[in-house]
Amino acid sequence: IIYSPISPLQDFTPYTRTKGVLNLWAGVEKIVGNQTLTQPLCRMVDPGLTEGMVEWVVGHCLRHHLGMDSHIVNPDHVWNQTCPPLARERPVTILGMGALGSASAAALRALNFPVTGWSRTEKPGLLHGDAGLARALSSAAILVTLLPKTPETENLLNADRLALLPKGAVILNPGRGALIDDEALLAALDAGHVGHA
C-alpha cells in the first residue's frame, strides 16, 4: 500500500495480506501512531532529498555565521566591515542524527564547524537523553533541529531548554515546527536570548 496522510485510507485492519506500507511523504508522525497499522512501514529515502536538506542547512549556517543579513538588510546603506570568527570557532549542534542530520553534520564538519550531534536514542559518538540534550544546547551557537514530530519530541525545546542556549544563539528548524514551544521561543527572541529563529 502506498500511503498518504491525506488519503481516506487510515484503517489498515482489513489488509491482513499486505506485505508493507510505503510512506512517500515527509514525516511519519500521522502513521506511526496509527493503532491499526500492523504491517511493516517503509519510508522513501532519496539522495536528492538528503542533498537538498544538506544544502539548506549549510547555506543557512553560513548565512548566520558570516552575518549576511546585516549586509543584505542595510537600510543605512553603510558598509559595516566585520570579520566573523572562523567556522572552527562557531559550534553547531544538530538535534536528530538520522540520515539528514548525519549528512548535514558531515558537510558542516568539512567546513571546519565543530558539530555536536544529539539523538533521542543512544548511538555511538552522539549525545543522548536529557543530560546529553542539556550539554548539546549549552554549546550551540547555531542549533539545527532535524527531529521527527512524535509525542516525545513535541515542544522538546521549551522555555527551560531554550534558556540553556548561549545568548544570541541562532535556531534553524528545517524539521517539524511542533518541536519548539512557540510562546517560549517568542519570549526568548523578545528578551534577546535567542538571536534568530
Predicted regions and their residues:
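Glycine-rich NAD(P)-binding loop of Rossmann-like domains
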Residues: 70-103
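Phosphate/diphosphate ligand-binding glycine-rich loop within oxidoreductases
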Residues: 2-72
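Gly/Ala-rich phosphate-binding loop of Rossmann-like dinucleotide-binding domains
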Residues: 105, 109, 189
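Glycine/Thr-rich phosphate-binding loops of Rossmann-like dinucleotide-binding domains
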Residues: 10-12, 31, 102-103, 153, ...
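NAD(P)-binding Rossmann-fold cofactor-contacting core
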Residues: 110-126
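Phosphate-coordination loops involved in phosphoryl transfer and adenosine-cofactor binding
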Residues: 38, 88-92, 168
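Rossmann-like adenosine-cofactor binding region
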Residues: 121-197
